[in-house]
Structures are given as C-alpha cells and as structure tokens.
Amino acid sequence: VLECVPAPLAALVSRSVSVPTIGIGAGPDCDGQVLVWQDMLGMVDGLSPKFVKHYAELGAAMRQAFQTYADEVRAGTFPATEHTYGMDEKDLEKLY
C-alpha cells in the first residue's frame, strides 16, 4: 500500500517490485486503487486529503437524518405504532 506517495515515486516502486501495489493518493500507476468510502461520499467534515474525490455529498443529509431520529426518540414520536410489532392480548396473558 502506497499512501500519499508522489506519483513518479509510486510508479517507480510499482515497476520495481513483483507484488501488486495499491495506491491511496499515490497516482495512477499503482496496480490498484483504494479510497475510504466515507471520504468518497462526503461524510467527513473538515479537511480532506488532496487525493480524495467526493463522488457525493451525503454528510449533511446523514447528519440531518440522525438528528431527526434522535429528536423523534426524545419526543416519543418514534417508534410509532406502524413501526412496532403487536401481539394478541391472550397470548401475552399466557406469559404471566
């Protein structure tokens, strides 16, 4: 794994070794590439390494979804009846 290695150096290493090289920010001449999926999808706030390409910006939508979930749990509106399994009263009484 070659991470944050200048592309010409990564190319030299890739040509010089008999094992496959995997690049993360090491240019296109490695045998394979990897990106952290949270970085790819824009889920991380703040500074991203130069080699990260955002294929989507899901971070804000995910934070909003988690906030809405937490708010509904605290307010007691989730889970509602439609999100809960019911049970016949007679079957419940058999357990006591």
Language model regions located:
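Alpha-helix-loop-beta-strand connector modules within alpha/beta enzyme cores
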Residues: 6-31
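C-terminal alpha-helical cap/extension of soluble enzyme domains
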Residues: 24-96
